[in-house]
Amino acid sequence: MNSCIIVLRLLLSGPFVFAPAWSYNLDVRHVQNFSFPLAGRHFGYRVLQVGNGVVVGAPSEGNSMGNLYQCQPETGDCLPVTLSSNYTSKYLGMTLATDPTSDNLLACDPGLSRTCDQNIYLSGLCYLIHENLRGPVLQGHPGYQECIKGNVDLVFLFDGSMSLQQDEFEKIVDFMKDVMKKLSNSSYQFAAVQFSTYFRTEFTFLDYIRQKDPDALLAGVKHMRLLTNTFGAINYVAKEVFRPDLGARPDATKVLIIITDGEATDEHNIDAAKDIIRYIIGIGKNFKTKESQEALHQFASKPVEEFVKILDTFEKLKDLFTELQKKIYVIEGTSKQDLTSFNMELSSSGISADLSEGHGVVGAVGAKDWAGGFLDLKADLKSSTFVGNEPLTVESRAGYLGYTVTWLPSRGTMSLLATGAPRYQHVGRVLLFQQPKRGGPWSQIQEIDGIQIGSYFGGELCGVDVDRDGETELLLIAAPLYYGEQRGGRVFIYQKIQLEFQMVSELQGETGYPLGRFGAAIAALTDINGDELTDVAVGAPLEEQGAVYIFNGQQGGLSPRPSQRIEGTQMFSGIQWFGRSIHGVKDLGGDGLADVAVGAEGQVIVLSSRPVVDIITSVSFSPAEIPVHEVECSYSTSNQKKEGVNLTVCFQVKSLISTFQGHLVANLTYTLQLDGHRTRSRGLFPGGKHKLIGNTAVTPVKSCFVFWFHFPICIQDLISPINVSLSYSLWEEEGTPRDPRALDRDIPPILKPSPHLETKEIPFEKNCGEDKNCEADLKLAFSDMRSKILRLTPSASLSVRLTLRNTAEDAYWVQVTLSFPQGLSFRKVEILKPHSHVPVGCEELPEEAVVHSRALSCNVSSPIFGEDSMVDIQVMFNTLQKGSWGDFIELQANVSCNNEDSSLLEDNSATTSIPVMYPINVLTKDQENSTLYISFTPKSPKIHHVKHIYQVRIQPSNYDNMPPLEALVRVPRVHSEGLITHKWSIQMEPPVNCSPRNLESPSDEAESCSFGTEFRCPIDFRQEILVQVNGMVELRGTIKASSMLSLCSSLAISFNSSKHFHLYGRNASMAQVVMKVDLVYEKEMLYLYVLSGIGGLLLLFLIFIALYKVGFFKRNLKEKMEANVDASSEIPGEDAGQPELEKECKDPGCLEPLQKTDEDGSGGD
């Protein structure tokens, strides 16, 4: 079991920045490392800064011995620390602690083992060493357990004084019988002596050998009832009972159990019993005071807390054997009947340690069945007091209390100690104890439990006095095996609030290292950054090859984010377990800067802190104001030389670490920028640059530099000053590792983590006359608004025009506010020519800023609207379809500026009203099935029924105030002299009553369509209406000549046009049907047909006579055709040549007429 505890401890800190390390403020470029190859890979397991050097612990590996090594930064060498001891120390260096008040060193080996009757006892070996490592060395064995296995000769020395009642006396006898019976089969021998004024041996070892029956041996015991001569009784037992002739064994362990109810009535010494293990049991009411209890200590073996037991009643004697059973072994975790558990046999005392003001404590994780506890060491290390769980419960078993211990300094009267039990109930626990500083019993005051199983909560503890006032404000509790959010390990911060520590926050490492062991080492550093607050370092040895985080102190606690993360590989390749141990409270280099020692596998790295500095800067201008004439547009046409402004910048470095003694030089990179917050700068350095970058070396002596800048022409913003910003940072060259012996060499400083920026402003001159006070007079009016009407079409827009004048001096930050109704939506604003160069920008104010309306805020000619200036502003709006409108909309405008007197505000406002017209969306058309043509003939019917059908579609309106609609239907006029007459009626769906009205006759009777009657029909807002015009057309005379007439009807939708308009124009709500009437005149045609037939026959006869005369009917066409067939049937021979052309044309029917013609014309060949 001893190996398990120590190996676990090694693993927790063994193989155990935010990207690569930030540079604040440990120097990772110039480091020093120490190693001692023969010490093995555990060299660096523990590091402590002692005196002017570093003490390194190197527990053993394999069968080698552990040791301490002293490393001197001045020489770079490490040498073993010589300790005179008769003990082999395998794990020496596993535990180191230093006293911050005296610098003494406490070094412990928790694995000191020895054999006791074939069993292994495990306790500690500790050394208290002077800070120079050469002075006297005190040696102690905390938790050392006497070996009482093997042969044991045990004597009961029991009180027989008169203060004992008979029943109490009998209970003592029963207790002795019970012990003897339970140990009857062991290697124990017993004897018993009653003491009072005199001493009487009740039975000897020889008697017990002969007769092992306790009842028989103690049957004759009689109560003596006299005084209590304890000193004499002890000497009597040593001389007269432990005698070989009375059965005592020479090789047996001598044990004396003293049972008494009062203080001794005699005085003497007990030197004769110094080789006897003495237990004393005080029973009864006589031991209530501290003095009476301490009186028993002189009779007991050391440590007295292990060998003195106080019982308030005699009834508790019967349960006391359970404690005696602790001297009989049982394997951890088992429970065998009649066997006992461990007490201090496997205490591993010294697995942790702390030292403060000469008061040392060491952890004893194996005590009390590995419930654990700690030992309060006396100054000489020879004795100690065990403190553990009170009361000792089953739950605390195997909790490893004492795995870590740390003092929590306090200015009060009580000493405060925290100790961890990382295996308590698998989640871990930390207990806080207190003790009066003048000495006295320990008392447990607080329990803090972990939350995650297996996290090893309490595996590392650290008290932090943030403001260094002697009072511990923070308790840091590590859980290096905690897992969450891909982070391995966590440190919980508990703050002392009144009398208890309460959790306030936590620290954690970088993501991506679930096994990083963040918190395996925690160290409260001295102030390394010059803010006079304690800083903290946290090790994570398994984040890659190891990392160390630096958390700076802040008022009331620690910064939640690290100021620096240092990876071991930044300094040395191949490094392992960097951050397994940390200590940083001293200046090892003699330069006034704190150094931090960090343990790794087989080596120790010493990191030097860098001097933290602040740069004192100053910026001034000459002249103090920018001349306005240099930025006016007219200045560009002149040949005047630009005067510009001289800018003076001064630097001075100041160290924030008062102890720093080196030469201070800061290599500074600075940047000067003009109007850096603007896209276009109003100031320019030579070469047209708005930014200058430079380098300089800064010392504590003030140094200044002068720069010149000028201005571009036509600057519009002449109100706000030009911003001049100075930013700076430090730069350093890559260098070789700094030799700590070269104290006169400059140490590169580092800037404190604050904004390294200074901003100054240089204003413009004000052109406001001699009094330098500009007074403006603004006037605002709407213009060109008489013909404005807002027609609410779907894409309706509205433009309003404002005229703004300034009749006095320059106006600063002119702002026009325009209120408009909810139904309008701002689209854009523009300046009308010839003032288009004047800038204007508008934005709509939040709706909560205005009530029942909306508003625009427009900046005009920002920031200056010059004297005697005028500008026309056109603002354009879109309309919202679902807006609420009245008959008019009202717009209100107001103008203001920063420098107009209140008596001149009368003409700063303007109001206008614009009529609103609402759309009517009505579409009408005639139907295809209307009658478009009729005809009258003498033989046709005299009456025709006709119909004209119209369809009316009315689209729903988005507005509520719709007017009444009328359908106006007009029908044709009846001409009194015409051949036809007609009658008309109106039919509508849905039905309505229409009222007819005669129309006046048109002046032009020849008009194609003439209307005589108009029907007025009220209609509702329905989606569709059908209108049918029915007519009867009658022929009332005789048709004497053919003619064509047109009869027309029309439909129009009418409404009040003063507030409404046709959305798609008036024509869209009108339709007309034109019907043609054909009058056909018919004559008698029979005689014409007869004469035409006779003429046709006569013409045919004349044609026949002509054909006969020319011989058409006399040709022998048939014979010619047959001859031609015969000729074509002949087959020519193979050698027949090409046919002759003359032979091809022998057809008489074809050629005869031509030949005849030739003969007639030429007379032949």
Curated annotation (Swiss-Prot):
Keyword Repeat among record annotations: yes
Transmembrane segments: 1085-1105
Carbohydrate attachment residues: N33, N86, N185, N646, N667, N723, N859, N894, N929, N1056, N1067
Keywords for this protein: Calcium, Cell adhesion, Cell membrane, Disulfide bond, Glycoprotein, Integrin, Magnesium, Membrane, Metal-binding, Phagocytosis, Phosphoprotein, Receptor, Repeat, Signal, Transmembrane, Transmembrane helix
Cystine crosslinks: C71-C78, C108-C126, C650-C704, C768-C774, C842-C858, C994-C1009, C1017-C1048
MF (Gene Ontology): ICAM-3 receptor activity; integrin binding; metal ion binding
Family: Belongs to the integrin alpha chain family.
Official protein name in the record: Integrin alpha-L
Native source species: Bos taurus (Bovine)
Gene symbol of the encoding locus: ITGAL
